[in-house]
Amino acid sequence: MTPRSYLYVPGDQSRLLDGAARRGADALIADLEDAVAVANKGAARTAVASYLDTGTAWVRINADTPADDLAAVADRPGLAGVVVPKAEPALLSEVDVLLGSRRVPVLALLETARGLRHLHAVAESPRVVRLGLGEADLAGELNLRPGPDREELWPIRSAVVVASAAAGLLPPVGPVHTAVRDLSDLERTTELLLRQGFRARTAITPTQLATINAVFTPSAEEVEKARATVALLSSGTGVAVDADGRMVDEAVVRSAREVLARSEGLQEQ
């Protein structure tokens, strides 16, 4: 199953790590970066390495200490992948070398102007299977003051969606929603991300997971409509008209197949 939700868990909080797998996230990210104070980085590496002996998680490393972070976790059986913050080609190349022959995928977070400048190189880097956005860091570096709908960042979101598709990656992962108690706004902004081409979102608290998962799960009505669309074209001559009077061609069917693939992937988990 392709994850719809990724839950960040502070790497130095063993109790939270141990309980996180039961909170409803499609994937966990054991965080060695922002969620951990500098003084606790060593303890966090030890705690995450211990967790990965029996549990499964992605690990977000630090951009300035990739060697130390990967030395602690790269050989643990539960390492699902590495989240690279502030992703730029040079850092991704360094991570690739450090991982060596290990078959470890990478989720690259776009959080810097330089990373955006080299967006397609980031998307095409070895090991990268998915892109994500760190909009707080980007807004700070670009001197943006985003409004409630964050329109100021929409061009960047579109660029990340295009780069992902062009490189054959999974659809990208949306940024965290920092108003942790406002689940209504979380739903609204996650639906916006869905329309913009994202198919997952990161979370910073378990209470956000049900909302995120629901938005990225095709409804029964959507699945039924998608099946009808695919069947309509398969029985026609390349172009057809559906019950609503809408022209159906291969481009429309491609979107319908994407809905069905997401639904079937969830049923297989």
Per-region residue spans from a language model:
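Expand to "…catalyze enediolate/carbanion chemistry for C-C bond making/breaking, isomerization
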Residues: 1-269
